[in-house]
Amino acid sequence: MTTSSYFLLVALGLLLYVCQSSFGNPHTRDSGTTPDRDHSCGGELVDRLVKLCPSNRKRRGFPSMLKARAKRNEAFLLQRDGRVIVGDCCDNYCTDERLKGYCASLLGL
């Protein structure tokens, strides 16, 4: 990949991120709402997945890799399974046991 192609790809990615954040994301909690213990949205949900899901990969690099992947596209992992996790854990009540049920499909284990 040439330098100009790489630059164009990065610029388009940043433009997409700005457009998405300026129109709002329905899967992140408003700043005016108080966080519940069992309701998690966006980065909070990714953090819960990192803590709850077992991994066969190296422990040192896996959480940071998962967080970086999610931050690239505002909860990319949450969009993979048809917003089912968002419905269970962001919009509604979600227990840790229920969230553990999504580990295999989300992390490809």
Swiss-Prot record:
A GO molecular-function descriptor: hormone activity
Tissues showing expression: Expressed by the venom gland.
Record-linked Gene3D superfamilies: Insulin-like
GO terms for biological process, alphabetical: glucose metabolic process
PROSITE patterns given in the database record: INSULIN
Cysteines paired by S-S bonds: C41-C90, C53-C103, C89-C94
Pfam family, one: Insulin
Residues cleaved off as propeptide: 25-29, 57-83
Compartmental location: Secreted
Entry GO terms, CC: extracellular region
Homology family: Belongs to the insulin family.
Role description: This venom insulin, from a fish-hunting cone snail, facilitates prey capture by rapidly inducing hypoglycemic shock. It is one of the smallest known insulin found in nature and lacks the C-terminal segment of the B chain that, in human insulin, mediates engagement of the insulin receptor (INSR) and assembly of the hormone's hexameric storage form. Despite lacking this segment, it both binds and activates human insulin receptor (long isoform (HIR-B)) with a moderate potency (EC(50)=373.2 nM).
Protein name: Con-Ins K2
Species of the source: Conus kinoshitai
